[in-house]
Amino acid sequence: MKTFLASLAALLPVVALAHDYSVNDLMVMHPVAKETTATARSSAGYFTITNNGDAADRLIGVEADFPRVMMHNTVVQDGVASMRHMDAVILEPGQTVTFEPGGFHVMFMGLSEPMTEGEEIPATLIFENAGRLDIVFKVEKIEAKDHSDHNH
């Protein structure tokens, strides 16, 4: 019994860090938003989506309590990176799509105060077929250059 309890206790930090969500055959894993500076007017959100089903679906929107929330993709053309608005992200059967720095990401725009480490940002992902999925972005410290200081 002691071995079982010790094993269970060892897993608790991992379980506490994991925050996954699912709707139908879609799994959304580890949504995070990056901590911002005091003057930042936007921040980026990241997560991974896996379609475990037999049919394609599309992520067609993200809602959160900010003046504007948009899906973007970073595109590099002639050595210059730019953000392109995405109306939808296609999720083929068996496919995993990662929203990450330098690729797909969610922009939270019009911040009135900084996002701070440990804060939780409620949001809703809207899928064409699976419908709405409420998730929570956990705010983490800035570890690498991201889009926190972009003004769109």
Language-model features, listed with the residues they occupy:
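Positively charged n-region of N-terminal signal peptides that target proteins for export
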Residues: 1-4
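Hydrophobic alpha-helical transmembrane segments of integral membrane proteins
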Residues: 9-10
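N-terminal signal peptide c-region/cleavage motif recognized by signal peptidases
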Residues: 13-15
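Compact, glycine-rich, soluble single-domain proteins
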Residues: 19-152
